[in-house]
Amino acid sequence: ESGTKEVPLKEYCIGTLAKEISVDFEEEALKAQAVIVRTTIYKKIEEQGEKAVMTERFFTKSDMKNQWGRSAFQKNYKKLERVWNETDGQVVMYNGQLAMVPFHQLSNGKTRIGKEVLGTDEYPYLQMKECPKDVEADGQMESKLIKAAGAQITSQDSAGYVTGVKVGEETLNGET
């Protein structure tokens, strides 16, 4: 759908939480994600004011019913609502300001340095961290053989993520 839609803030937050993380994750992981979602949303409101337009993708209640099935909807929604309420008011701060808190479910075994990803020194707290269990996660590793004459990696960041690939005469950005 295009355009804007007014949604109660709590419903939007729970919908964002449902979109970003599986309701089957451990409760503490859900709580951590709730804090990240709240921080991101509050930061946007702080920057843009009360009429801020939220652009993060979220699940509507209808989406959640489709995702979980009608029979599991009430139980799962109540679980996310409880997690949201139990973390009420909790946000991530850095130097007295709401922090930018990018999220990814899995890495290639290391998180990335914020400066390398975002191109700015504005987020010095985003440092590389080893995450060895990420590479063991279900569905994380998949191999595909693609035959492309002359394809070669031209650059990688310090965590080993590919940031550039040359195919023939064209150089592609690994970030897009």
List where the protein language model places each region:
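Conserved, single-site charged/polar hotspot
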Residues: 1-176
